[in-house]
Amino acid sequence: MTSTSKWLLAGAWATGAGVVLMACLLAGKTAPSSAAPAAVPPKPAAGAAAEEQFQSPEETAKKFKAELDRLAERKGLVSIVELVRQAEAQKTTTIETLPDPGQKLAGAAIYAKARPGVVIIGGNAKGKRRRAPEMIFGSGFVIRKDGVIVTNCHVVIGFQDMKTVGVMTDDGRMFPITAVLAADSRNDVAILKVEADNLTPLPVAESAPVGAKVYCISHPALNTPETENGFYTLTEGVVSGKFRLRLHGFPPLNVLAVTADYAKGSSGAPILNEHGAVVGIVCETLPLYGDAQEQDVQMVWKFSRPSSSILALLREKPPAAKP
């Protein structure tokens, strides 16, 4: 749901092991008790154990579609028209408490800790437009265990092109969206509510300085059928800049530029610091070309909004003055 850029993820590893065992057997004789013990079979290489962790994006997409079809059969769901109307109302909300950031962690530990708090937001597209994707996916993250979700405002507005929408956690639970609690189209942030009471929330930090290491967990599209995304992809980078920019006709706003990669399908994903706390939210990409034909890509800006744009929607407004 963000603008796209050409990118490639590839990874490979190779493992090898060799075991040479020699034994001398004397005809009609057994080996003496003092002989060296038999060689212990080597343990499986680390790569072999990791094979079980490989996941099929196709199966995840199928799971999402199946759960969404079941969700569509439920009665009393809030209509997409109403959700879009709430997003356009540009309101704020009050959140009583947010989780505290924990200790500093390495990349693998951050992924393990934060992944359960990242969600897939998506829906099935309306109509039968030629070459149109059947399913459309975006990203989001939990900030309260009772079902408060953060994503982009443009993700919510995009619901109007879908028949049914839902939010799925990494363990395959599907939830309907019951309300848009708050939204800010200028900063492209929306706060959603889903029917849940045992989700894994991510802490939200105040800020991150330029040069700080950051991570992104999102669902970028793959160069395969459109219903396949690289669900729960982890990328790493740094905060490369903090700018006041005019974007999309809005007055200057705060932009957190990062080098952690993301692409279409990553909209609404968290930008995390080394404590696993949210310091920004993915919004868009901006490719820079070296020629008028836009063929020579020189670099791609990754623009997110700082966490302050999220916190601004969660702070309670001062009470109105009494007459």
Task: Report residues per predicted region.
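Terminal peptide-recognition signature
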Residues: 119-121, 140, 147, 151, ...
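Sec-dependent N-terminal signal peptides
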Residues: 2-31
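N-terminal activation segment of mature serine protease catalytic domains
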Residues: 36-139, 187, 310-323
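Conserved active-site neighborhood of the chymotrypsin/trypsin-like protease fold
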Residues: 99, 126-127, 133, 144-226, ...
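C-terminal subregion of chymotrypsin/trypsin-like serine protease catalytic domains
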Residues: 56, 272-323
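Extracytoplasmic
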Residues: 105-106, 113-120, 133-138, 144-146, ...
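Sec/Tat-exported extracytoplasmic proteins
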Residues: 68, 72, 114-118, 122-125, ...
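Flexible, gly/ser-rich surface segments that form the specificity/activation loops bordering the active-site cleft
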Residues: 133-135, 154-160, 200-254, 262-266, ...
